[in-house]
Amino acid sequence: MTDLPDSTRWRLWIVAFGFFMQSLDTTIVNTALPSMAQSLGESPLHMHMVIVSYVLTVAVMLPASGWLADKVGVRNIFFTAIVLFTLGSLFCALSGTLNELLLARALQGVGGAMMVPVGRLTVMKIVPREQYMAAMTFVTLPGQVGPLLGPALGGLLVEYASWHWIFLINIPVGIIGAIATLMLMPNYTMQTRRFDLSGFLLLAVGMAVLTLALDGSKGTGLSPLAIAGLVAVGVVALVLYLLHAQNNNRALFSLKLFRTRTFSLGLAGSFAGRIGSGMLPFMTPVFLQIGLGFSPFHAGLMMIPMVLGSMGMKRIVVQVVNRFGYRRVLVATTLGLSLVTLLFMTTALLGWYYVLPFVLFLQGMVNSTRFSSMNTLTLKDLPDNLASSGNSLLSMIMQLSMSIGVTIAGLLLGLFGSQHVSVDSGTTQTVFMYTWLSMASIIALPAFIFARVPNDTHQNVAISRRKRSAQ
């Protein structure tokens, strides 16, 4: 990358900052949830919606981001994404009620949904093909640092300032990024086909109302009749999309994708698997603070080993899959993650706090192996003409399943606990114990899906991918 022009390197820095902002925000909020609840006068059991509102908005908006970038231009959309994300951060900091905070987080989600995919598209357009991998490695590195810094930084700001600062720190970075985008980023456009607005709206309605219905009366206060109505609307919307996409070459996501067995199994496993995994980043800091009495900063520091384990495992995951095959790796890591979740709960409740960093490091390793294996399994056998559509659908499913996972975790806390749990409550640890046991069971369920993956122990993943790209 050293032979790239200075202007191109500056543009890559802009994209990298966007990746950093988006990835930092996915983890920095988790540590602050108990403090937010106290400040806003809410039960900690309701605060999962702060995460859900952001992640669900990202899932809904992702399918439109690439088309908008091609139609309006990458500079215009990337600038808009940064501005919306920054404004959302400002409104989050100014929020005085939970509902105001949820609306502001949704605005952040609109910006976050466009920032990363449009950033990837920008790199593709400004960097020669032979240097694309090196450029993507450069711009995604800050995105890996964000989750590492997020929990500890969030805890530090909450403990020594206030939760508002986890959003306020985005504002100067966002302003600099927006100005730099206007000054340095070229506005590439491409000829686009007509956007599938009908399909987009049907999917958006289906995902949003079903997630809202899942939150149930505990979180939303809706009556059983209203929840049943939401479920009916969501199911009808998704069925209508399936009918709409049948034999429709302009559909948002072609149903031809599901003719590839590994894609179908991988997508189903990714959806179910990330529901379980999505609970962990939300539940762990909440449990450490409310269940065990850790300070926000201490709870944030405890999350760092999990991120380090995840980053370290990425270097050898291809060799692991090549040696043992997708089916064995995915079944083993799914059951292993369930056992590690139980181990974390047991060591924490026994008071063996010195063991927790090692358990969380192991959790990060297992989770990272499973994530990487699920992603490559889902996409590896798709024909070239469906690869882009399949990748977009996988990205949307990843965000949707994470929002559902956090929603279920909040629902479990509400089912087992009272409306107001606290460190002083004698029943609090019992509430968390039942919640962790339920989570471990949910995490183990996708093993039944992965057991149906063809036995490909001797299929070399790296060679297979090189052959596909060469064709």
UniProtKB/Swiss-Prot annotation:
MF GO annotations: transmembrane transporter activity
Which Gene3D superfamilies does the record match to this protein?
Answer: MFS general substrate transporter like domains (1.20.1250.20), Multidrug resistance protein D (1.20.1720.10)
**Which organism does this record belong to?**
Escherichia coli O6:K15:H31 (strain 536 / UPEC)
Q: What is its main location?
A: membrane
Q: Which residues cross the membrane?
A: 12-32, 49-69, 77-97, 102-124, 138-158, 165-185, 197-217, 225-245, 263-283, 286-306, 342-362, 396-416, 431-451
Q: Which InterPro entries match?
A: EmrB-like, MFS, MFS_dom, MFS_trans_sf, Multi-R_MdtD
Q: Which NCBIfam families match?
A: efflux_EmrB, PRK10504.1
What HAMAP family does the annotation carry? MFS_MdtD
Indicate the segments annotated as coiled coil, or none if absent.
none
User: Its membrane topology, per UniProt?
Assistant: Multi-pass membrane protein
GO CC: one term?
Answer: plasma membrane
Would the keyword Membrane turn up in this protein's UniProt record? yes
User: Topological domain, Cytoplasmic: which ranges?
Assistant: 33-48, 98-101, 159-164, 218-224, 284-285, 363-395, 452-471
Give the subcellular location. Answer: Cell inner membrane
**Could you tell me the keywords of this UniProt record?**
Cell inner membrane, Cell membrane, Membrane, Transmembrane, Transmembrane helix, Transport
Residue numbers on the Periplasmic membrane side: 1-11, 70-76, 125-137, 186-196, 246-262, 307-341, 417-430
Q: Which PROSITE patterns match?
A: MFS (PS50850)
Can you say what this protein is called?
Answer: Putative multidrug resistance protein MdtD
Q: Which family does it belong to?
A: Belongs to the major facilitator superfamily. TCR/Tet family.
